[in-house]
Swiss-Prot record:
Biological pathway: Amino-acid biosynthesis; L-leucine biosynthesis; L-leucine from 3-methyl-2-oxobutanoate: step 2/4
Catalytic activity as recorded in UniProt: (2R,3S)-3-isopropylmalate = (2S)-2-isopropylmalate
Organism: Xanthobacter autotrophicus (strain ATCC BAA-1158 / Py2)
Species lineage: Bacteria, Pseudomonadati, Pseudomonadota, Alphaproteobacteria, Hyphomicrobiales
Cellular component terms (Gene Ontology): 3-isopropylmalate dehydratase complex
A Pfam family: Aconitase_C
GO terms for MF: 3-isopropylmalate dehydratase activity
InterPro entries: 3-IsopropMal_deHydase_ssu (IPR004431), Aconitase/3IPM_dehydase_swvl (IPR015928), AconitaseA/IPMdHydase_ssu_swvl (IPR000573), IPMI_Swivel (IPR033940), LeuD (IPR050075)
Function, as annotated: Catalyzes the isomerization between 2-isopropylmalate and 3-isopropylmalate, via the formation of 2-isopropylmaleate.
Gene: leuD
Protein name in UniProt: 3-isopropylmalate dehydratase small subunit
Family per record: Belongs to the LeuD family. LeuD type 1 subfamily.
SUPFAM superfamilies reported for this sequence: LeuD/IlvD-like (SSF52016)
Length: 201
């Protein structure tokens, strides 16, 4: 998993509440178990017209936001059915951080497992970040995970909280496999000792 320390980039404003996982990645894209290639399906029902062409009104199709690394979204982001394809699609598009006032629990947990930082802020701070994001490529946000702060283009700072364990995993790039491998010496020692005690196993 790619490490997350300090991220600087354009933030796209998605001023919608209750964005569910079917809106993030519709069901027709769930046939694959590959994590790559899902970026094209991200928000596809809003992003594309019926004929498959880009919807110019959708934020991620606008030139200022096509390379966005940060998504500033409305309340209750990631609600709906459980599908890990949702963070996969965001990551494949290039989104490494989502900022909102609240997230659905399963989506929130899945973000951490896939190297995406979900940041919870107050409504007041979200409105400020929406204002920053509205400026597009003329203003970038800096997400400083070690310092637990979001720095705006005009020097404003928004602090955020994060579980220390999840913070360490993101900074060190540790997913579930990486965490298990940290225990590899202890696992190997146990297997050796167990084999000596019970060689018939």
């Amino acid at each position: 998993m790619e490490k997350f320390t300090v991220l600087e980039g354009v933030a796209a404003p998605l001023k919608l509440v209750n964005v569910d996982t079917d809106m993030i990645i519709p069901k027709q894209y769930l046939k694959t178990i590959k994590r790559t290639g899902l970026g094209t399906g991200l928000f596809s029902e809003m992003r594309y017209k019926d004929d498959g062409s880009d919807n110019p009104d959708f934020v991620l199709n606008q030139s200022a936001y096509k390379n966005a690394k940060i998504l500033v979204a409305g309340d209750n982001f990631g609600c709906g059915s459980s599908r890990e394809h949702a963070p996969w699609a965001l990551l494949d598009f290039g989104i490494r951080c989502v900022i909102s006032t609240s997230f659905a629990d399963i989506f929130y947990n899945n973000c951490f497992k896939n190297g995406i930082l979900p940041v919870v802020v107050s409504k007041e701070d979200l409105d400020k970040l929406f204002d920053d994001a509205d400026r597009g490529a003329n203003a970038t946000l800096t997400i400083d995970l070690p310092a637990q702060e979001i720095r705006g283009p005009d020097g404003g700072v928004v602090k955020f909280e994060i579980d220390p364990f999840r913070k360490r995993c993101l900074i060190e790039g540790l997913d579930d496999i990486g965490l298990t491998l940290e225990k590899a010496p202890a696992i190997a020692a146990y297997e050796t000792a167990k084999g000596a005690e019970q060689p018939w196993l």
